[in-house]
Structure formats: C-alpha cells, structure tokens
Regions:
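Active-site residues of response regulator receiver
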Residues: 55, 82
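Acidic catalytic/metal-coordinating carboxylates
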Residues: 35-36, 62-65
Length: 205
C-alpha cells in the first residue's frame, strides 16, 4: 500500500519539485497540497493521508501555531519542513506533537527516510533536535517582547519609550538586560539574532 502524502507550502516551485520527487519514489503518492493555514486546517483533519510535510511560514499564519491548535484533533502525522532550523522552530515542533523536522535543503533520501519512519509510527527528529526540544523555546517576558518588536521595527530608544509610555532610561535598562542575557553587544546583533532564530514567531504557551 502506498504512503499517501500531503504537502503544505505556499511556494509553487517548492511544492511542485518536492511532489514530483516524492511521486517518483516507489510506494509514495502525493495526493493533496495546501498553500495556506486555512487550507492546511482541512488537510490535517482529513482521513486517508499518512504523512503531511508542512512549512512554518505561510501567508496567513504560522504552521507551528496550527500544530498547537490541532494537537489533539489531527488525523495525520506531520513532518515540519523549513529553510531554518532554529531553536524556536524545533522546540515548538517537538512540543506541539509533530513527528519530525527536516530542512528544505536536506537531500531527497533524508526526506524519504523521514516520511518512511513517520508513516510506520516512528520519529524523524535527530538526537540533537530532540535535545533542543527538551530545552524548550526561548521565552521572552512580555516587556522584552514589546521592546524587541520595536527594535526590529527600527525605532530609536526615545521612540520605544514613547510607544511604551515609559522612560528612555527604562528602555536602555531593558536593552542592557537583553544584551547580557543573549550575549550580544548591540541592537543590530540583537535584532539579527532574533530574526535568525525566530524569537518572536512562536507565542509562549
């Protein structure tokens, strides 16, 4: 019996290439595709699929947040696929009940092996990914999230202070604490790391 596969990704070239590659594997059949959270919700509730490969960043939301919402109701195993293997992404995938995590740049044989493992009830997380999952996602306090969002928006300390109705000195203290906590020396380093590691994409639960 074929492993029936669904793909959730909003990039037609990615979906087309992945679907063609998997369809060429003996025993694999790509039978459904979704390009948004709305479409993916229906796909995850559908009977007859064995494995869904799901991207994180979608036009109308975040695939990991969808996993959190559907954790107790999904009818299909999910492998998260992403261009980025950040601590936030991997930890959320583990925590919200995905069965694996694979980079989009992984060789096809790695994707095939992940699908086969998951389709037979196994896990497609590496040992390192599971360790990251057990450590959990980076947790920012509400004020840290507010300040960081405004840093990423390019606001000055004075603008952040005005927006948060606090003093410039308090904002500078907040930033100093973030610098110390994450081992960075500037707003630029802080912003680059936050973007790269997706600190703000997954809300704490």
């Amino acid at each position: 019996m074929s492993i029936r596969i669904g793909i959730v990704d909003d990039h037609p070239v990615v979906v087309g290439g992945l679907a063609a590659a998997l369809d060429a594997i003996d025993g694999f059949e790509v039978v459904d595709r979704a390009g948004s959270i709305r479409e993916a919700e229906g796909l995850l509730a559908r009977d007859g699929l064995g494995v869904v490969l799901m991207d994180v960043r979608l036009p109308d939301g975040n695939g990991l947040e969808l996993l959190a919402r559907t954790e107790g109701s999904r009818r299909v195993a999910v492998i998260v696929i992403s261009s980025f293997e950040t601590t936030q992404y991997v930890a959320a995938a583990v925590r919200f009940g995905a069965q694996g995590f694979v980079l989009k740049t992984a060789p096809l044989d790695e994707v095939v092996e992940a699908v086969r493992r998951v389709a037979t009830g196994g896990s497609a997380f590496s040992a390192g990914q599971l360790r990251e999952g057990l450590r959990g996602p980076i947790r920012l306090r509400p004020r840290e999230r507010d300040v960081l969002r405004r840093v990423l928006a390019g606001q000055s300390n004075d603008e952040i202070a005005a927006g948060l109705r606090t003093s410039r000195k308090t904002v500078e203290k907040n930033l100093s604490e973030l610098f110390r906590r994450f081992g960075v020396a500037s707003r630029l380093e802080l912003g680059l790391r936050a973007e790269r590691e997706a600190w703000l994409e997954i809300e704490p639960r």
